[in-house]
Amino acid sequence: MAKLEAQQKDDLQEKLIAVNRVSKVVKGGRIFSFTALTVVGDGNGKIGYGYGKAREVPAAIQKAMEKARRNMVTVELNAGTLHHPVKGRHTGSKVYMQPASQGTGIIAGGAMRAVLEVAGVHNVLSKAYGSTNPINIVRATVDALVHMKSPAQIAAKRGLNVDEIRG
């Protein structure tokens, strides 16, 4: 119940991407613990991801959610899609995303889809290359979204107005 109340209080969407059982081998045998990868977002351009580890699954998920809330970034969106095609990478994972017309939907796989949904992107075409490790895909996707610039940001950087940028 406390989790639901917290979710309603700050109005963030939460998605659990992966839960994994890991083990530590010690002299007496194996010690099992669990890891959880989560993303949170407000559906309007704010996203964060978190990775938690604990001896029990609920504790790992809770830690991951808390880390995701602390690790929030803001992304400039263009009416539910991207401003321009973007690439992101993290270690062996590379992602490519491009804007799509209204009604296309989110064409993305697994972990990338979860990030785009909580970010508030509704129409996008995307592809993951290289490693499909969920942690690396999430980090590459966030990297790509953070490096996306709106026409206003590009115009300000070049010292022009938006109409001159758009041609």
Swiss-Prot record:
InterPro entries: Ribosomal_Su5_D2-typ_SF, Ribosomal_uS5, Ribosomal_uS5_bac-type, Ribosomal_uS5_C, Ribosomal_uS5_N, Ribosomal_uS5_N_CS, Ribsml_uS5_D2-typ_fold_subgr. SUPFAM superfamilies: dsRNA-binding domain-like, Ribosomal protein S5 domain 2-like. The keyword Ribonucleoprotein applies. One of its GO terms (molecular function) is rRNA binding. Residues 12-75 form the S5 DRBM domain. GO terms for biological process: translation. PANTHER family: MITOCHONDRIAL RIBOSOMAL PROTEIN S5 (PTHR48277:SF1). Belongs to the universal ribosomal protein uS5 family. With S4 and S12 plays an important role in translational accuracy. Located at the back of the 30S subunit body where it stabilizes the conformation of the head with respect to the body. HAMAP family: Ribosomal_uS5_B. Part of the 30S ribosomal subunit. Contacts proteins S4 and S8. This is Small ribosomal subunit protein uS5. It comes from Shewanella frigidimarina (strain NCIMB 400). The gene is rpsE.
